[in-house]
């Protein structure tokens, strides 16, 4: 593995967290100002929007932290064992995540939380994929299969992380109620 590819691999946790910080800091205020507009335009999403808007910033940060820990673990194990398949799957899912944010912004015709880092981090993602194809001897078809795996793994993990966030919010509410 080249130093350049190793750098790209090791940067993923930092890149993810940069994106996560934008989401953590801006999601709740943005939802407070925009949820009614989105619900009016997309009534089928009203239940999901209300649920996301009710989630505390602390609970959302917990979900992002769980994802960050997993990405750090995948990155460390990939480097340790010089086996990058799962890391490629996670990178592909992250790229899709960024593209979805850009798509959401285009559909809403406005800024959404995480748009800035989605645009700013795409060059890193393209660079990492090009390095993988060039130096790690991944074929495009292998990367495509790993992308499917990554999407499934990340989707399942996201559901679990958000369930944990909701549980955390309930515990936080109990704690607050007991300390009044």
Model-predicted regions and their roles:
Residues 24-53, 167-180:
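Cytosolic, membrane-interface loops and tails of multi-pass inner-membrane proteins
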Residues 80-84, 102-112, 135-137:
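Membrane-interface helix caps and helix-loop-helix hairpins in membrane proteins
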Residues 92-101, 112-132:
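Hydrophobic alpha-helical membrane segments
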């Amino acid at each position: 593995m080249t130093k350049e590819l190793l750098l790209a691999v090791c940067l993923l946790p930092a890149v993810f967290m940069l994106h996560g910080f934008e989401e953590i800091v801006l999601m709740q205020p943005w939802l407070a100002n925009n949820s009614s507009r989105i619900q009016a335009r997309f009534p089928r999403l009203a239940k999901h929007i209300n649920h996301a808007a009710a989630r505390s910033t602390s609970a959302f940060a917990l979900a992002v932290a769980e994802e960050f820990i997993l990405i750090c673990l995948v990155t460390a194990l990939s480097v340790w064992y010089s086996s990058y398949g799962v890391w490629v799957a996670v990178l592909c899912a992250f790229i899709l995540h960024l593209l979805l944010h850009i798509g959401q912004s285009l559909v809403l015709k406005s800024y959404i939380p995480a748009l800035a880092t989605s645009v700013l981090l795409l060059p890193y993602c393209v660079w990492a994929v090009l390095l993988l194809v060039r130096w790690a001897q991944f074929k495009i078809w292998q990367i495509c299969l790993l992308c499917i795996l990554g999407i499934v793994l990340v989707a399942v993990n996201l559901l679990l992380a958000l369930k944990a966030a909701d549980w955390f919010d309930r515990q936080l509410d109990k704690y607050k109620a007991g300390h009044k």
